[in-house]
Amino acid sequence: LFTRPRRFGKTLNMSMLQRFFEATAKSNAYLFDGLKIAAYPEYMAYQGQYPVISISLKSMKQASYTDAFYMYKNLIAKEYEKHKIILESNQILESEKEIFRNIMEQRADQNVYLNSIRTLSDILEKYYEKNVIILIDEYDVPLENAYHEGFYDCLLYTSDAADD
């Protein structure tokens, strides 16, 4: 959790962490050429080695719970789309692939979305056989907006249901 004042570079730092750790088809190592970290092989050994879930909730400023949830579904579906390579894997059960597809295509029930980040993390961990790095930027925007728009209690109730 990065707690810093506005305009302090949190988003930039999270983007840098994503590019450093994320396992991608094309290596991001060149982005760190000439930087001090590149001089440390013990750190560079971690570069490009982990699955990363990266979501920004900055756009979660809707006037109603329904609209906010619709936007959340879109954000989550886009993140699933980034990881759709796992659908080709034999390591992932067909039932897990079906859940994955339903979320990616925005056909899942509301309750499925409440745990969708955890579900994606579990599936990615199984596929890559490595821990997953989860980066959530602007995490406070949905709650702050819900408070100002009058659906804060509804949002909290929904988040309590996700914990069950």
Predicted regions and their residues:
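Hydrophobic positions on the alpha1 helix immediately C-terminal to the Walker A/P-loop
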Residues: N13
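Conserved lysine of the Walker
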Residues: K10
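Conserved P-loop NTPase "ATPase switch" module shared by AAA+ and STAND
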Residues: K130-E149
